[in-house]
Each structure stands twice: as structure tokens, then as C-alpha cells.
Amino acid sequence: IAYEKIIHQFDEVFTISKFEQNYTKEKFNKGKFIPVFHGNKEFQLLSEKGKFALYHGDLRTSDNRKVVSFLIDVFKEIDYPFVIASSTREDWVKSKIQNFKHIKFIKLKDFDHLKDLFENAHINISWSFQESGTKLKIINALFNSRFSIINKNVIDDKLISNLCIKVSDKSELIKAINKFKNQPFIASDEYVNTLEYYLNNQLNAEKILKQIFS
């Protein structure tokens, strides 16, 4: 990788995933972890119950399409509304869900549209079949919605993953959805503090500035 040839010239390397931090520490003896930056300022306090489970993503990527196929297969076995939201591949999704009245595709317009979906979702599902660090979509769901169910590939930051419901396969995912679909969501003080302090954009930017100018 081209940039690795000049890393030795840098005083420090900032990383936004634990995987990257471990890699740069091991290979270059540099690497300071800073949580991913995002556009959220504060946790949105919503009612305790939403109306559906939500998956959103860019369906131009093969991994996300594989996830959608997997989740459709999951919700064939669950009597609960499921919304797939994306700005792409509408016809492809609709061809897969045409026989399932409780599964719906919504074409995303913009982030405000996504926030409206977050506001009404009771369960957010983030899944990947490949290791990907911490996905921004999870941060957005945690700030703006209710329950988040994940598998291990979408978060490598323990503090953030502790805010989510972690499962590893189809069977565990079905059990989790059935368990939480009727359970009220009540955010603990620890939940809110992790979002508003640990993931605070301004505080994390100040950490970078302090490192640069100290």
C-alpha cells in the first residue's frame, strides 16, 4: 500500500477503527484511536415503541445485497413489519419481496428521510459478511432510533457494541427480533453518555488538535 511507505515520516497516525489502530501499532509503532466522526450532536429521545424493523444501506455493494437477501430469508419466519431502505436497486428488492406483505422497500431520498425512518423504527439491523470496522450507519441508528441488533463484523469498538444487541447467526437473530419487537426501549444514562461524550465530535476533534499542537 503506497501510503505505508511514508508513515515513518509522521509523528502520529490517527485511526477510526480498532483494527486499523492495532495494525499501525504493530507494523509502525504508531496509531491513536479516535472514534468515527458523524453528524449527530445529541441522542434523540423518542417514545418507547416503534413500528417496524429497519435495514438501510447502499445496495450497489455486493455485501449489502447479500445482507438484504439474508434478512429477507430471516423475516420470512417472523411476523413483524420489516422495511428495507435504500436509494438504489429498488426493482431488485421488490422482485424478492413481492410475496411477503410484511416486508416493504422504501426508496431513500436523503438523510432527513432516513431520520424519519429511524424515528419510527423499533429495531435497526446492521449486518455484514465481511469485517468492516465500525459502520457509520450504526452510529446514526444509535443516536436517532431505538434497538440496534448487529453481528460482530460491523463494529470493532467494544464501547459502541455494548450499546447494541449482538448475535452471530440466523437463529440468534430471529430470537433477538422476537424478544425485542414488543419490548419498550428505554435508554440508560450510560447509553446516552456514551453517545454524547465518547462519540462527541467536538471533544474528539480537540483530542486531535491537542496531539498535533502539544
Per-range role (PLM):
Residues 163-171, 178-184:
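Conserved acidic donor-binding segment of nucleotide-sugar-dependent glycosyltransferases
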Residues 140-143, 147-151:
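Short hydrophobic beta-strand element within catalytic cores of glycosyltransferases
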Residues 35-98, 104-115, 119, 169:
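Conserved catalytic-core segment of nucleotide-activated headgroup transferases in glycan assembly
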Residues 5-8, 110-122, 143:
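Short acidic alpha-helix that forms the nucleotide-activated donor recognition element
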Residues 11, 118-133, 146-147:
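Acidic donor-binding loop of glycosyltransferase active sites
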Residues 44, 182-214:
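A charged, aromatic-enriched C-terminal amphipathic alpha-helix characteristic of glycosyltransferases
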Residues 114-115, 131-133, 153-162:
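Short glycine/proline-enriched, acidic/aromatic patches that form the donor-sugar handling elements
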Residues 1-13:
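Membrane-proximal helix-turn-helix segments that form the acceptor-binding/catalytic region
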